[in-house]
Amino acid sequence: MISFKRIEIKSLESYNNLKNAVPSQLIDMDVIKRLQNYLGLRCDEIRVEYPYYDSDYLSTYYIHYSQKLRPYGKLCCRLHILKEEEYYGYITLRPTAPGTKIGKTFLTPELLIRENAYLMLHNFKAHVVGNEMQIKSFPWKSQETDISVCAHTAAWTITRYFGNKFRDYADATIGELVEHTSNDWGRKTPSLGLTPVQVSDLLKNYNFSPLI
């Protein structure tokens, strides 16, 4: 059964209350410090949704984490960010290695920046307690250590943005991107990164026309 816990943000120390609301395998001090640094007091409430089945994490779980000696869980959680009852998006927390637990994230940029900027944005949907919420955002996620490293994650943000905004492009989970990566000289996971040619070939699978 899905539950929601409400955390009021009155000071930076309020973020420490998340450690009592989020399962220990999904949160560490890296998460707390990032929230304090980037969100700070720009939000006044976080609603913790647990459990949450994240399609992107599950796509890597079945092809990688489930085959590891150390057991990894399937369940994630979402942190829904609000200020004065206005919805600003969500952050997914996943049971990966310390320092990599922040997964798929959609946040309204006004929450993070104050200066003028040109941004590529699209309306993404989130279902929260039966309500469909709209988030004008650009997709983001932190990289993992051995399956979705920097280049995979960059390709994911591109395909997720263009695949949702334009019909001519295909969306993909991070696991699908890993599976579709050409690698004639070794295994796909664990991965140390991708070459420019690999990234170009990967994006071609999703109707892009890269130029190196």
Where does each model-flagged region fall?
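Weak global preference for isoleucine
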Residues: 2, 7-9, 27, 32, ...
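Context-gated lysine
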Residues: 5, 10, 19, 33, ...
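Non-catalytic propeptide/linker segments at domain boundaries
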Residues: 75-136
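Proteins with a high burden of low-complexity, intrinsically disordered sequence enriched in S/T/G/P/A and R
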Residues: 84, 98-101, 161-163, 208, ...
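Intrinsically disordered, low-complexity regions
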Residues: 41, 74, 90, 100, ...
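Proline-rich intrinsically disordered, low-complexity coils
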Residues: 23, 51, 71, 95-98, ...
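Active-site nucleophile-adjacent alpha helix/oxyanion-hole segment immediately C-terminal to the catalytic cysteine
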Residues: 117-187
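Conserved active-site-adjacent core of cysteine acyl-enzyme catalytic domains
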Residues: 1-69, 178-212
